[in-house]
Structure formats: structure tokens, C-alpha cells
């Protein structure tokens, strides 16, 4: 409970709130250029940052302002993103990167916003995101549930972004109780642990991609980039969530291995 650190966090959140534009957006993209690249990915972390900060925030007024801001942020997204038949942009088309996998990961803070507010429109938006399957070319949630394919064999294999999508699916299960999604998350986690987690607790020996790292980690050819720190930290966060969900010690062991 470092008072200086807490003040720095409060000041940072206050500063973030001033970045909101007249549409309720907190984005580094202008309106004409939004929904490209890493726009939604960054907006995800704006909302997640506020949500995690609220867990330690002692200022009730600041917490209320965070919730109000997040509602405006998400309401704007709901007005723009959705099925084509409604004249909206599909979530998996809101980035030209990784078939929309990065944009789909905004699922996590959307579900958490529903948990905070109880407003069904946020759960409905989360349900839409889940229905799109994470990418424009395959439904990664179905692949995980069917449990016939290792994640490094999926059509899109970006490690960090994929784990982030499954963190969102886990939150969606908690909100809905739909058993299919619980099993999809657990099966995905177990396959990652078996096929892609290395001896040092990370993954992705080909740049930042899942690539059967459990086997490829012994390859003597070095490509220059491997086992991204972002992948490691996200795997740790995912392991913690899986441990809370299942009580299975293997996820605690993998968390500790990555930490050390």
C-alpha cells in the first residue's frame, strides 16, 4: 500500500478521463481512421485499466466517474460494431491485423462492464462478440470446445491476442453459466500448457506466435524474436484465472515457473 504509487495511479486515471472526446471515445485514432490496426486493442486496455483500478480505489466519486466513462466508451462501440445486416461493422473486421483476433479481445472488459452495471445491453454485446468466434476465418471458441486441434494449428496463431480472447470467454462463462464456454476455456488452457509452454514458462518460439514451442524450444536456430514477455504475463494471468476456475494445481505450477 505505497501511498505515492496509489496517488500516481489516481492521477493517471484522472488524466485518462480527460482524454474522452465528445463521442465518449478514449482512443488514439481519429473518428475517420478508427477501427483499424490496434484501435480496439488499445481501447480494451483503457477499460481494463479503469476496472482493475476500481478494485483498489477509495474514492467513490472517482469510481462512479470511471463507470460512467466506460459506459459511454462501450455505448459508442455498440452503436458502430455489430452484424452487417444492421448496417454495422463486424467486430472481426475492426482490424486488418490477425483476422480481427486483437479486436475481438475487447470481450473481457465488455463482460466486466456488464458485471459492474448489470445492464443487459453489455451482455448482449458480449454475446455478439462471442458469436463471431474471435476471427473472420474460423471460430476459435468452437475449435477449443471440440478439442481436436492444438492452438498452434489454428488458422490464426497470435499467442498474446488469442489468450486474451479466451480470458474474455472465461468472464463470459462466469456471467452466463454456459457450460460449453467453460469447457472451451479449460480445454484451450490444457492444450496450450501441453504443446506451447516452454521450460521457462513462456510460449511462441517463432516471433510472437504459437508454434508447438514445447518441442521447438530445443531448436538451435535462433530467429531473433521469441517467447515475448507479453505472452508470458498474459499466460500468468490466464493461469491464475484457470486456477480459480478449476482448482487444478498444474496452472499454479505454470504460473510460478513463468514468474521465476
Q: What residue ranges belong to the model's regions?
A:
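Glycan-recognition and catalytic cores of secretory/periplasmic carbohydrate-active enzymes
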Residues: 1-260
Amino acid at each position: 500500500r505505497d501511498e505515492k504509487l496509489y496517488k500516481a495511479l489516481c492521477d493517471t486515471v484522472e488524466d485518462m478521463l480527460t482524454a474522452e472526446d465528445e463521442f465518449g471515445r478514449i482512443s488514439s485514432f481519429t473518428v475517420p481512421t478508427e477501427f483499424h490496426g490496434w484501435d480496439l486493442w488499445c481501447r480494451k486496455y483503457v477499460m481494463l485499466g479503469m476496472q482493475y483500478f476500481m478494485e483498489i480505489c477509495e474514492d467513490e466519486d472517482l469510481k462512479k466517474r470511471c463507470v460512467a466513462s466506460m459506459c459511454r466508451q462501450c455505448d459508442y462501440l455498440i452503436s458502430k460494431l455489430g452484424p452487417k445486416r444492421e448496417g454495422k461493422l463486424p467486430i472481426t473486421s475492426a482490424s486488418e491485423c490477425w483476422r480481427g483476433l486483437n479486436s475481438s479481445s475487447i470481450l473481457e472488459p465488455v463482460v466486466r462492464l456488464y458485471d459492474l452495471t448489470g445492464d443487459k445491453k453489455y451482455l448482449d454485446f458480449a454475446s455478439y462478440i462471442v458469436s463471431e468466434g474471435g476471427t473472420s476465418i474460423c471460430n476459435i471458441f468452437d475449435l477449443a470446445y471440440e478439442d481436436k486441434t492444438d492452438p498452434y494449428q489454428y488458422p490464426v496463431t497470435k499467442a498474446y491476442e488469442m489468450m486474451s480472447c479466451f480470458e474474455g470467454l472465461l468472464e463470459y462463462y462466469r456471467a452466463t453459466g454456459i457450460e460449453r464456454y467453460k469447457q472451451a476455456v479449460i480445454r484451450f488452457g490444457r492444450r496450450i500448457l501441453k504443446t506451447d509452454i516452454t521450460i521457462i514458462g513462456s510460449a511462441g518460439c517463432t516471433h510472437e506466435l504459437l508454434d508447438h514451442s514445447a518441442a521447438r524450444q530445443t531448436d538451435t536456430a535462433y530467429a531473433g524474436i521469441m517467447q515475448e514477455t507479453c505472452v508470458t504475463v498474459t499466460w500468468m494471468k490466464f493461469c491464475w484465472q484457470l486456477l480459480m476456475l478449476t482448482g487444478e494445481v498444474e496452472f499454479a505450477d505454470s504460473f510460478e515457473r513463468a514468474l521465476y
